[in-house]
């Protein structure tokens, strides 16, 4: 089954949705995301996710391209169109696609953010052994900043100081 996805204000079949190769989410991981669980066809704690999304966007000085009411409607429509009973809605907002790659943040009046939402069907999510009994976890050191020798696309710390 081909899913319906949401991209920049429009619904597309997933194989028809296209994003610029210059999108900063793709080139620099300059984006925020949220994942909202769906159980029994209903969004779980949508308000909490929307609040965290707004806080994340504010912290990165990114503009929010969609209102709370519109975002809720899009989530509900995607759940409906894709017949999601148990699963999730993934949302990502990037700083957009300026005309070229640059560390300097694009002018938000000249470059619109890119907003993408899609669903994933996860049947049995609520009744999985992990959901019922929990999972074991371990903690490990975060080595991201100690491994600057690896050229990853996560360049958040590169653009930030330039805009100070």
Named regions from a protein language model:
Residues 1-77, 106-158:
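Helix-start/capping segments and mature chain N-termini
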Residues 37, 81, 92-94:
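Active-site microenvironments in enzyme catalytic cores
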Residues 67-76, 86-102:
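Short, glycine/charge-rich beta-strand/loop segments that flank catalytic centers
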Residues 159-164:
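A short, hydrophobic C-terminal helix/tail in secreted or cell-surface proteins
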Residues 46-47, 83-89:
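Short, flexible active-site-proximal loops enriched in glycine and acidic residues
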Residues 80, 98-109:
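Acidic pyrophosphate-coordinating catalytic loop
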């Amino acid at each position: 089954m081909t899913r319906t996805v949401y991209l920049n204000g429009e619904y597309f079949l997933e194989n028809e949705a296209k994003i610029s190769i210059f999108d900063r989410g793709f080139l620099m991981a300059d984006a925020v995301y949220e994942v909202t669980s769906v159980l029994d066809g209903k969004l779980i704690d949508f308000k909490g996710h929307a609040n965290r999304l707004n806080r994340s966007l504010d912290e990165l000085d990114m503009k929010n391209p969609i209102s709370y009411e519109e975002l809720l409607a899009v989530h509900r429509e995607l759940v409906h169109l894709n017949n999601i009973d148990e699963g999730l809605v993934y949302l990502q907002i990037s700083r957009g696609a300026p005309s070229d790659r640059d560390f300097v943040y694009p002018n938000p009046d000249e470059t619109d953010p890119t907003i993408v939402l899609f669903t994933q069907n996860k049947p049995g999510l609520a009744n999985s052994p992990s959901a019922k009994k929990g999972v074991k976890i371990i903690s490990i050191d975060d080595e991201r900043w100690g491994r600057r020798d690896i050229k990853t696309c996560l360049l958040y710390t590169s653009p930030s100081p330039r805009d100070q």
